[in-house]
């Protein structure tokens, strides 16, 4: 076991919107330390949403997407005797945000649009409108937890 809990590093807000969640999103989007490319993709997607999103601004769509994809419950495996049970547990707020960001990026990368900017923009729009793959992932996670509600007393 570790001696002490790792300190949570403070993330600086992004320079354009002053939003810490956008900084975390950019950091998750980044490959091989290429932050400038990840930043271009993120801001490009927000600008594309501004053009196509209708009455909502890009930053509002982004915030709605993150909120809609945040999971409330998830399941963890727990061995009891010889059996492994999927035990539903509540998700901490920091993990909710991290999972939402991770799922949106993962499903955006799997989309069929041409550029990553388009993929990310359309995934964010879908998530904000409560549809799309990342929102479905949240729903599936919740259904899994509901199905295993009987094992909730194994929580630790």
From Swiss-Prot:
Gene3D superfamilies reported in the protein's UniProt record: Ribosomal protein S7 domain
Single GO BP term: translation
Alphabetic keyword roster: Ribonucleoprotein, Ribosomal protein, RNA-binding, rRNA-binding, tRNA-binding
A Pfam family this chain is assigned to: Ribosomal_S7
GO molecular function annotations of the record: rRNA binding; structural constituent of ribosome; tRNA binding
InterPro entries: Ribosomal_uS7 (IPR000235), Ribosomal_uS7_bac/org-type (IPR005717), Ribosomal_uS7_CS (IPR020606), Ribosomal_uS7_dom (IPR023798), Ribosomal_uS7_dom_sf (IPR036823)
Family matches, as CDD domains: uS7_Bacteria (cd14869)
UniProt GO cellular component terms: small ribosomal subunit
Key word Transcription present: no
PROSITE patterns hit by this protein: RIBOSOMAL_S7
Family label: Belongs to the universal ribosomal protein uS7 family.
HAMAP family documented for this protein: Ribosomal_uS7_B (MF_00480_B)
Record's subunit section: Part of the 30S ribosomal subunit. Contacts proteins S9 and S11.
Matches recorded under PANTHER family: RIBOSOMAL PROTEIN S7 (PTHR11205)
Job of this protein: One of the primary rRNA binding proteins, it binds directly to 16S rRNA where it nucleates assembly of the head domain of the 30S subunit. Is located at the subunit interface close to the decoding center, probably blocks exit of the E-site tRNA.
Name recorded for this polypeptide: Small ribosomal subunit protein uS7
Organism of provenance: Campylobacter hominis (strain ATCC BAA-381 / DSM 21671 / CCUG 45161 / LMG 19568 / NCTC 13146 / CH001A)
